[in-house]
């Protein structure tokens, strides 16, 4: 059953949050029509009249309406007195901000549906930075996250908010998000699940590089010692390289390339490497949930 948003048709769409603005608002085109007296003057002077240009066809209203799109809620925050703005990851449209009008009302059908870590089918309309949610359906089929798995889920959601630009679809990343939530719900080792997701996230957003070959196109050797240049990739360890680049065993890099985390050394060094890379690519911006995980579970 699809639950319709309690949207009031006369309510305006909210302005985009300031931190998410990436495109200047378009300005209405000025009228270029000339008065009849001006046209007559042109005719009198013998200048040829210009044929009015054809107007660009209007975008069909259906292009601004999306129905039953697979999606997950990443984050939500209050908007006005009775509404929410939800940050969602959708399969075919990437990360979007939607206003759920009336979702905070006591008897709103949306209150129990717009939950994190649950597969949803969302419908929305509009073309502004913040679309209007018009319907939400709980799809089901996934176990809820609890305990440490719940903290890991919030960490994954925060990474998506930090790394994924608005309206930049990543179907493979969406698929891996579903896989990650399923693995966490089934109590698979969090370290392996998180490292696997982090690598997919970096690859899909344009940061990841191969771990089994160096920048000099040499094969990584299990017994070798290496560092990871954030701009170029794996390099052989040397004294003249930046001290903040962690030294990683070749075996760790090979294990990570194969998504294999059964060795204790690989678990420890992969955590150090990924923490360094995420911090570098985020420009030093701290991850709130990462610190919680470090404090509580030392992940």
UniProtKB/Swiss-Prot annotation:
GO cellular component annotations of the record: bacterial nucleoid
Disordered: annotated segments: 1-62
> What are the protein's UniProt keywords?
DNA damage, DNA recombination, DNA repair
**Ranges of Low complexity composition bias in the record:** 25-41
Q: What SUPFAM superfamilies does the record tag this protein with?
A: ArfGap/RecO-like zinc finger, Nucleic acid-binding proteins
Does the record's keyword annotation contain DNA damage?
A: yes
Q: Name one Pfam family in it.
A: RecO_N
Listed Gene3D superfamilies: Nucleic acid-binding proteins (2.40.50.140), Recombination protein O, C-terminal domain (1.20.1440.120)
Q: Which InterPro entries match?
A: ARFGAP/RecO, DNA_rep/recomb_RecO_N, NA-bd_OB-fold, RecO, RecO_C
Question: Which Gene Ontology BP annotations are present?
Answer: DNA recombination; double-strand break repair
In terms of NCBIfam families, this protein maps to: reco (TIGR00613)
- Indicate the family of this protein: Belongs to the RecO family.
State its role: Involved in DNA repair and RecF pathway recombination.
The protein depicted here goes by the name: DNA repair protein RecO
Question: Quick one: which gene encodes this?
Answer: recO
């Amino acid at each position: 059953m699809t639950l319709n948003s309690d949207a009031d048709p006369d309510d305006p769409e909210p302005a985009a949050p300031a931190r998410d603005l990436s495109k200047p608002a378009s300005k209405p085109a000025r009228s270029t029509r000339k008065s009849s007296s001006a046209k007559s003057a042109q005719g009198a002077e013998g200048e040829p009249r210009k044929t009015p240009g054809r107007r660009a066809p209007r975008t069909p209203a259906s292009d601004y309406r999306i129905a039953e799109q697979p999606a997950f809620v990443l984050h939500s925050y209050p908007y006005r007195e009775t509404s929410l703005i939800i940050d969602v990851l959708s399969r075919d449209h990437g990360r979007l901000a939607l206003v759920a009008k009336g979702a905070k009302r006591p008897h709103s059908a949306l209150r129990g549906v717009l939950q994190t870590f649950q597969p949803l089918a969302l419908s929305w309309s509009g073309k502004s930075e913040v679309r209007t949610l018009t319907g939400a359906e709980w799809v089901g089929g996934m176990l809820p996250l609890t305990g440490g798995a719940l903290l890991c889920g919030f960490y994954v959601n925060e990474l998506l908010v930090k790394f994924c630009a608005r309206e930049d679809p990543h179907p493979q990343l969406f698929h891996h998000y579903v896989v990650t939530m399923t693995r966490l719900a089934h109590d698979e080792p969090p370290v392996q699940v998180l490292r696997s997701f982090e690598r997919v996230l970096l690859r899909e957003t344009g940061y990841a590089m191969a771990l089994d070959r160096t920048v000099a196109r040499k094969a990584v050797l299990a017994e070798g010692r290496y560092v990871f240049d954030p701009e170029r990739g794996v390099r052989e360890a040397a004294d003249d390289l930046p001290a903040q680049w962690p030294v990683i065993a070749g075996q760790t890099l090979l294990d990570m390339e194969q998504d294999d985390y059964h060795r204790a050394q690989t678990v420890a060094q992969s955590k150090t490497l990924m923490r360094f890379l995420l911090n570098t690519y985020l420009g030093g911006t701290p991850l709130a949930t990462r610190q919680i995980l470090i404090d509580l579970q030392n992940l």
